[in-house]
Regions:
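Conserved, mostly hydrophobic/aromatic
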Residues: 48, 135, 139, 172, ...
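Flexible, glycine-rich active-site loops centered on histidine and acidic residues
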Residues: 38-86
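Short, acidic/polar
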Residues: 38-45, 123-134, 215-225
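Short, well-ordered coil/turn segments that N-cap beta-strands
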Residues: 23-27, 52-54, 106-108, 140-141, ...
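Active-site pocket-lining/capping segments in soluble small-molecule metabolic enzymes
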Residues: 74-105, 112-121, 128, 159, ...
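Active-site beta-loop-alpha junctions enriched in small/polar residues
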Residues: 1-4, 30-34, 61-62, 113-119, ...
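Glycine-rich, proline-tolerant flexible connector loops at the mouths of alpha/beta enzymes
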Residues: 1-15, 64-75, 140-156, 238-241
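Catalytic cores of alpha/beta
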Residues: 37-49, 127-131, 156-159, 179-185, ...
Length: 248
């Protein structure tokens, strides 16, 4: 016999409601295409709206670990652009059931993902920006970028977006490196490049405590440059290492 340990914890709605009600901090749940039918998504959004959680980020989600490409749920949204449309429709009082009598309008502010070094499945950055523009046309209000470690990539991306006619705010996404393993993990998993100077510094580090400090200092310098350039908001990917972000 094998003992099964089950750890119970609140779901997304419960956690977000707790954050807002207990700490008066706006929660921004990620709404995914993967694993949800359109009906599931609508029900989730109705709950969030009722609780006053009106900021969301619409994402497609990744392929499952044992699959090579993303497969949408049957009767679910296949692309983030479709998910944005569904949320935007609710903002206009348009529900899946057109005959619904209590179809009150929601008031979601919708964020989407952008990729300064292009999405790993996109053939080029230009084509990726084309699809990003579609998400904006469908109702997205702002963009949060994938992590990057060279600020020039972010500034070039913003310039390309503006040239393409994208005018919504673009929030830079940052991640402090914390371990030597991440030198291989981050480029492979997120399809981003690490600057040579950062790689060499991490390779020479005597242990992960030293790596952690290098990652904090690198990310802090990025942050200072971005703020100096006029960016009003920065987004940090903690990925279970909140103390690193807190140090920054």
């Amino acid at each position: 016999l094998q003992k099964k340990i089950v750890k119970k914890r609140p779901g997304t709605v419960g956690i977000c409601a707790g954050i807002q009600n207990k700490y008066s901090v706006d929660a921004i749940p990620h709404i995914l295409c993967g694993g949800f039918t359109k009906e599931d998504t609508e029900n989730l959004l109705i709950d969030l709206d009722f609780l006053g959680i009106d900021n969301v980020v619409a994402l497609r989600g990744d392929a499952l670990k044992n699959e090579t490409y993303f497969k949408p749920e049957k009767e679910g949204n296949e692309y983030a652009s479709e998910l944005v449309t569904q949320i935007s429709n609710l903002n206009n009082g348009i529900y899946l059931d057109e005959d619904l009598k209590n179809s009150a309008k929601t008031n979601f502010c919708i964020g989407v993902a952008g990729y300064p070094e292009k999405h790993m499945e996109a053939p080029s950055l230009d084509s990726d920006i084309h699809f990003l523009k579609e998400k904006i046309r469908n109702g997205a209000d702002y963009i949060i970028t994938q992590m990057f470690f060279d600020n020039k990539k972010f500034f070039d991306f913003v310039e390309k977006c503006r040239t393409a006619g994208i005018t919504v705010p673009i929030i830079p996404g940052l991640k402090p490196i914390a371990t030597k393993k991440q030198l291989n993990l981050i480029p492979h998993r997120f399809s981003v490049e690490l600057p040579d100077d950062l790689i060499m510094a991490v390779v020479k580090a005597k242990d992960n405590d030293h790596v952690k400090q290098i990652g904090i200092e690198w990310c802090l310098q990025q942050s200072k440059e971005l703020v100096a350039a006029g960016l009003p908001v920065l987004h940090y990917y903690s990925m279970g290492k909140a103390e690193n972000v807190k140090a920054i």
